[in-house]
Amino acid sequence: MADTDDKKAFDLAIRLLGEREHSRKEIITKLERRKFSEAAIDKTLERLDQLGLIDDRSFAEHFVGSRSRKKPSGKYKLRYELFQKGISETIIDEILSDYDSSAHCLDAAMKKFPFLKGDDHYKRKKLYAFLANRGFDSHSIRETLDQIFRS
């Protein structure tokens, strides 16, 4: 019985990793939701480690890169999301150390700006709230708004 449970847990983990890269915590959470035993989960993680299929650093790099392209976010939001996915503070700090918040802030603002209606004061207020919600720091937001409304 335990062997089939181990195999099912491993097969599910492989299927999940085939869809996209996952953090260690995500794999654990998804296996726990399916009611796999702690022993089966531990064996699955051990096998995934041996095969080099689970790597939190690689996951974090891909996650930040994907976010940067699809839905630019600030360091605060990225830090929170990575922490929620079980990435260690050390890895998060290393990955985000060379993240250019100002460039991504401008990119996010330029994508949103054409859809804003109203006078400049209203647009500025809405854009500030949008960027703050995306996790950008106030300094980057002010620089971006000054750059947009200067032209």
From Swiss-Prot:
Localization, UniProt: Cytoplasm
Example GO biological process: regulation of DNA repair
Organism: Chlorobium phaeobacteroides (strain BS1)
Domain of life: Bacteria
Function: Modulates RecA activity.
This protein's UniProt keywords: Cytoplasm
Family named by the database record: Belongs to the RecX family.
Signal peptide: none
Record GO cellular component, one term: cytoplasm
UniProt keyword annotation of Phosphoprotein present: no
Name of the protein this chain belongs to: Regulatory protein RecX
A Pfam family annotated for this UniProt entry: RecX_HTH1
Alphabetical list of PANTHER family matching this protein: REGULATORY PROTEIN RECX FAMILY PROTEIN
Gene name, Swiss-Prot/TrEMBL: recX
Record HAMAP family: RecX
